[in-house]
Amino acid sequence: MAKDKDVRPIIKLKSTAGTGHTYVTRKNRRNDPDRLVLKKYDPRIRQHVEFREER
């Protein structure tokens, strides 16, 4: 069905604040080969914090 090395895999973004909150998104491996880091809202602490790609 799906290719093992998909160009746009589904990834989890985990909060660096240690709350355990995650977002699920897709990323393009050709444009972003490194681990993705985005600043997003963490509702558990009501602040914007960095979310890092989890493997």
Swiss-Prot record:
This entry carries the following GO cellular component terms, namely: cytosolic large ribosomal subunit
Source species, domain of life: Bacteria
Key word Ribosomal protein present: yes
GO terms assigned for molecular function? structural constituent of ribosome
Which keywords does UniProt give here? Ribonucleoprotein, Ribosomal protein
Tell me which family the UniProt entry assigns to this protein.
Answer: Belongs to the bacterial ribosomal protein bL33 family.
The protein in question is named: Large ribosomal subunit protein bL33
Query: Organism, per UniProt?
Result: Renibacterium salmoninarum (strain ATCC 33209 / DSM 20767 / JCM 11484 / NBRC 15589 / NCIMB 2235)
